[in-house]
Amino acid sequence: MEPDGDTHVLSRVLAKSSPSVFMPRFSAFLLSLLALGSHGAAVAAVEAKTRPNVLLIVSDDQGFSDFGFTGNPLVKTPVLDRLAAESAVFKNFVVAAACSPTRSALYTGREHLGTGVWGVPPRANLRPDEALMPAFFRAGGYRTFYAGKADTARLPESSPWDRGWDQGYFVSGYQHRDPTLPNRGETLQAKGWTADLVTDLILDFIHAEPGKPWFATAAYIIPHLPWVCDEKFSAPFLAQGLSPDLARCYGSVAQMDAAIGRLLAGVRAAGQADNTVVVFLSDNGMSHKAEADRELAATDWAKRNVHGLRGHKATVWENGIRVPLLVRWPGRIAPGERKQFGAVEDVLPTILDLAGLRSDSVKHLPFAGVSLRPALFDAAVVRERAPAFRIAISGAGSPKPQDESNPRPRRFEDHHLVFRGERFKFHALPGGKSALYDLATDPVESTDAAARFPEIAASMSAALREQWTALLATGRAFATTGPVEPKRGRKK
């Protein structure tokens, strides 16, 4: 069950080194927002009835098996399970192999390599001509807001507020408690659990100017390492006999689930649940580590990776890129599983379609994604979608950080690339080898099916190489954007 809704004035959760200076200025800002809400109330009321609000919720490193509704008997996600029961659920859905690539694709509707993002920082600078999701909503008369993980997309020589967000509180690093929150030149030192603060910030935004449509992103940093949570969430897992590592991991997930529950309850308490499209996804698959230099114990990994998917975060095996997508719009979108194959690039075209916003309202490069609206409104619809092009972010076959300031010709055979389609997935492995997997019968990618489907293997191989060549020809990928990353020695 979602808890009762509650609003939290930001002044109760944010503190600064000089509160006597900061708090009055913020209070004035909040009052100004409330005053604006009364201006043109009749027009705003009409807009609110005809245009849905959009709430985008993104979790961090939450793999396909990290949910109760996908079949994990140990993890506790009652809120997300309920959201799934009320949503269209896409289980044949893929993101990129790591956070920055996924988020750049999410916010641009484009394949991440073409946006200039080819890894995590410092390989994650978006090109300045990329248009981001909130810009389309702002152009359509929406208020826009962001709270949470800072690497939505790194924006050299511009700020997030120049790219479509009216306001945004960006968590620096993985501070699960008492985070630093930059916002329009202010650096705020918040007090409390970050998951709760993200929820509070979004709720304050929702209530600040009633009657005008809004687009908000809640980007939680859970369950990204380090696993740090309130002990009341990890204690039940310890009592069940789970290891401290897994108890903290699942405790973090449970804490985020509770925060999302309060967020959804707040939307409902504001009377806006029926006119709000809620979209939920994770940015990539689960990490195979318990700490930066220590892998999760094999027994814990088996308990977490209950579907036995191959790989992990940063790889292009299924466990690195497959996550569920949830879309809820009460009374408009019927709940239930969708068989349609989708990819993260599809989210932007889809929500613009649902909101009735024109994509040509903002100058942008061509979307790689397509709208999933047909499948949302008719569960029987399964339309052909082009395979998703993906690249490993770390390990064998990944672009190396040192290439950033020492560019050299890129060879197809040096990388681990995949073409992931609705049923078939083609791997171009480093060293020139390849494999084809039939995910309909082999979702764990255990048996090369190229000999059974030689024509499909040949076709996907040629298409993958063609896309790679076309990408390099644009000059947009693998840009020289920063210094060499220092080598990190392993802890003894």
For each predicted feature, which ranges?
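Formylglycine-dependent sulfatase
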Residues: 44-430, 434, 443-466, 476-492
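Bacterial N-terminal signal peptides
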Residues: 27-38
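Intrinsic-disorder-associated, low-complexity terminal segments enriched in Asp/Asn/His/Tyr and depleted
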Residues: 4-6
